[in-house]
């Protein structure tokens, strides 16, 4: 019974983290569509704040043993790659 509860908490934690990551990914995709992020410091600040918040959530979940450290790294790494692609796309547009 206890292992079912732990497993349920782990699944719920992962689902919540993935939902938060999806929200950030949508913000990135909107900016990719418009390539305006570097022109909008407020939007960049929002993305940075969201990424920082998610990294803290992931760290907390890892420390509680709700998700594996590798799962958290993969989740954050994917978002960082998308953010990097956004910056690269905007830079290429400017050239």
From Swiss-Prot:
One Pfam family cited in the UniProt record for this chain: DUF1507
SUPFAM superfamilies named among the record's database cross-references: EF2458-like
InterPro entries xref list: UPF0358, UPF0358_sf
Coiled-coil ranges from the UniProt annotation: none
Disulfide bond positions: none
UniProt similarity note: Belongs to the UPF0358 family.
Name used for this protein in its record: UPF0358 protein BA_4159/GBAA_4159/BAS3861
């Amino acid at each position: 019974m206890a292992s079912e509860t732990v497993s349920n908490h782990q699944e719920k934690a992962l689902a919540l983290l993935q939902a938060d990551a999806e929200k950030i990914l949508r913000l990135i995709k909107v900016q990719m569509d418009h390539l305006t992020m570097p022109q909008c410091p407020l939007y960049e600040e929002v993305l940075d704040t969201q990424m920082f918040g998610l990294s803290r959530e992931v760290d907390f979940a890892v420390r509680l043993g709700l998700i594996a450290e590798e799962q958290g790294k993969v989740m954050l790494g994917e978002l960082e790659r998308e953010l990097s692609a956004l910056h690269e796309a905007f830079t290429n547009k400017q050239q």
